[in-house]
Amino acid sequence: MSQLYALNGQPLAGKSDDLANKLAAFGLSQPNHSSLSEQQSTNSLLHGSGAFNKPPLSRNSTTNPLNLLYTQTQQPARSTTPFLLNPVGSSPGKLPVPSRNNSYLQGTAESNSGNFANNSISNNCWNSAYNSNSFEGTGSSPNFPPQNQFLSDSRSSIATLNAIPSLDQSVLLNPNLRARTPSLVPEHYFDDTDKSVHSKSSSGSNSLSEASNDDLESSIIQIVGGLPDDFDDRELSGIFTFCEGYDFSKIESENGHRKAIVYFRNAIAALKAKNMLNASSTNNFTIIQRDVVRQQENEYHKGIPPLTTPSLYSQRLSNNYDSTTPGFPRFSPANFDSVINKDVTSESRMSTSYPAVLEAFKSFNPIKAPKAEYLNQSRASMGNPSPSNWNNRLLQPSSKEQAVYSFQTQKNSKGLQFTSNELTNPTAKYSQLPNNIANIGESNSLSNQPNNFAQTSFDYQPNHPNAISPKAKFSLPSRPSYHKDNSFISKQAIDKSNPFEEALRLERTSPVKELPAIRPRTIPLNGVAPYESELRPPPKWKPMPDLKVVRSRPSLKQRPLRSAEYVRVCELKCLQEEEFDNKVLLEQVESNVQTDHNSPCNTIYVGNLSNPDQEKKLRLAFSKEKGYRRLCFKIKGNSPMCFVEFEEVCHAAKAMEKMQGAALDDKIKGGIRLSYSKNPLGVRSTENLSTTASLFQQHGPPKKSTDCYSAKASAAVERKYHFQNMTPKPNGTNSVTTLNRTQTHSSEVNDLFDIFEFPSK
């Protein structure tokens, strides 16, 4: 207590026999009560040390002093003034209201003689501003002290500001007690954030902010207007980087409307940042301090699980949230009573805020009692579920609880007595597990009864070994004995009406006695390469064509065979085409013979060449012609010479007609000039040429190159050359050697080599 007085700047007052003098000296205001019994019960609340004598024994006890001081049904609406103005204590309550003559601040305690039980409390300890007819700012205006009376310390302006905006102080408890004793009474008794009991003042008495209490307690601010189109998350975080308590921010877009959401560690930091931006002259943002959704805030504060009904649970989370340890809730059996009582008023707000959620919540009926009876029952009848009286409350319910929650006490076949509650444990009928397979039928028959359930999680009596409780370990059913004959041994006879036992009977009579053990495949050292073929998808299935369908298609039927007459006609047509081509070729050759002095042959002479480096270009140009055989390029003096040999004379004639005047280089004017060679390539005698020309005129142009060689051979025979038919090369070489020994001219032997060319290896 001495530390509390040191925090408030008050000297420790001496002990006094009169409790009223103590209250006046300590600065505790006491309101006027209407009943004498309540004053007498309050007389035993405090002793000389200023602490509480007795803790609350039970919630429903009429002699409990806390029931008189902290009545749940008379909780006033919390003031919208930010709780950051409270310099004393940890509870976000109101500041002490000064008395009429400020005697407790000046150290002079004036009180009438009399005792506390006779309701003789000094009027100096009561603020006259609370003598109005209403506590919500409606009705007659309150009476405030004259303006010439001032407080003697620095808290005067704050206390006066606290008294002016709203008159929501509790009638039964002075704010001084709330500010001076934060550790003696649980903090949830001081929490008066439930605004549903008393509506807000219709005159709008909040002078600091027009936001609601939930908005001021929110750690999230939203910028709903004034955001430029090119405003991104990086620029948004740059605005709040140096703000105290800033966590993170983001920009969201809903239906084309962009808004920014900024998260802070607490509501004070969010309020400071909001006020700082509003005070800026360059600020064009529309800022509100409000949660996006209560469930998002639950996810933001780590440690608080998300809830499905925000209206029912958001208020109790804010009331039971521990400000000393951010991010962790503070639930206990001591404050569970206040949470339950506030749910009654939360449902009324939920019907207006979330009508669809309320209808969905009402449609969920886990019990068999009428739905209206459950919803109309007061939550306070559930009691204070402290660990010391949980079992007593459940085993001895009230009349309403017995009618609604329908506790059932049954005995199973083994004579074990258990208690069930379908509301607290909706899955109780499935929580009983059999010990072995033989008892499956027994457990099913027990669970099929309408009013027979297993043991609940609130019953801690270990009389049922298979019951599942919150602190008990989950026990699996014992495994039945298994033998080599693939049969299970049970103590009772198998019931064929039970599907489980029928399956066991079929398994026992199955011809398969033992199945081979399944061994896992080991992965080889080279990885999954051997299984690559198995991992490939199967090829696409293509159906085989039906032979009957294929044969029935007219396009695939066998074509008729050609007749002999048709073949003869085709052969005659081909011969006529060849004769026509030969006639055309003969006319071309005759015209060339008339213009050219040399007789036509299969060798073409290429003239008008000035550059000796044109051999590659000539080979590339003539190699594309049909019947090309070889090219001979020679240089005599300064002028190059080129001969091109073809397989047949007709090919040479076509090539000469096509390539006549072709320009291989820009330096040569007129292009190349083509003419028949005097001698075929390799033939040097002029006599042979005359003989070949005479044969050509007699028999017509040859069709193949072999005809040219046959003409040369016949000319040689006329000159009485010696011919021998020799197939192997050595025999031909020996014959040539023998011929050289004879009296023949060397020119004649060279002609033989030109006619008979031996293949080289």
UniProtKB/Swiss-Prot annotation:
The protein's matches in InterPro entries, at most eight in alphabetical order, are given as: Nucleotide-bd_a/b_plait_sf, RBD_domain_sf, RRM_dom
Database matches in PROSITE patterns: RRM
Superkingdom of the organism of origin: Eukaryota
Keywords, comma-separated and alphabetical: mRNA processing, mRNA splicing, Repeat, RNA-binding
S-adenosyl-L-methionine as a keyword?
no
Ranges of Polar residues composition bias in the record? 31-46, 58-83, 99-110, 442-466
* SMART domains xref list: RRM
Compositional bias, Basic and acidic residues, is annotated for 188-197
Molecular function terms in GO for this entry? Answer: mRNA binding
Q: State the GO CC annotations.
A: cytoplasm
Q: Which GO terms describe its biological process?
A: mRNA processing; regulation of mRNA catabolic process; RNA splicing
Signal sequence: where?
none
Instruction: Please give one Pfam family short name.
Output: RRM_1
* All copies of domain RRM, residue ranges: 223-289, 602-679
Spans annotated as Disordered: 31-110, 188-213, 442-468
Indicate, by first and last residue, each region the UniProt record lists as having compositional bias (Low complexity). 199-211
Q: Does the keyword RNA-binding apply?
A: yes
Miscellaneous: Transcription is induced by mei4 transcription factor.
Name the record gives this protein:
RNA-binding protein mde7
Q: Which gene encodes it?
A: mde7
